[in-house]
């Protein structure tokens, strides 16, 4: 599933990153305690968080324009 974060504003990206971090933490707990129906979802979420971190850093450094 391809995510398109390029159209997000900086505030939207930070909010989405926080949401994904919470979802990732929940999936980690579920995988330790019990069964997760889609174990690859953790990898997808982790990579989306990394993409958002990269884009936020680019905005802060001035590489990417708002």
UniProtKB/Swiss-Prot annotation:
Q: Which InterPro entries match?
A: Ribosomal_uL29, Ribosomal_uL29_sf
Q: Name the Gene Ontology molecular function terms of this record.
A: structural constituent of ribosome
GO biological process annotations for this chain's record?
A: translation
Cellular component GO terms, alphabetical: ribonucleoprotein complex; ribosome
Q: Which domain of life is it from?
A: Bacteria
Q: Note the SS bond partners.
A: none
Which keywords does UniProt give here? Ribonucleoprotein, Ribosomal protein
Please give the family membership noted in the entry. Answer: Belongs to the universal ribosomal protein uL29 family.
Specify the protein name: Large ribosomal subunit protein uL29
Q: Which organism is it from?
A: Borreliella burgdorferi (strain ZS7)
């Amino acid at each position: 599933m391809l995510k398109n974060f390029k159209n997000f504003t900086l505030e939207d990206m930070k909010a989405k990153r926080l949401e994904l971090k919470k979802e990732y933490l929940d999936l980690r707990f579920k995988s330790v305690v019990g069964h997760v129906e889609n174990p690859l979802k953790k990898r997808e979420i982790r990579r989306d968080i990394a993409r958002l971190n990269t884009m936020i850093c680019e905005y802060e450094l001035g590489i990417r324009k708002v």
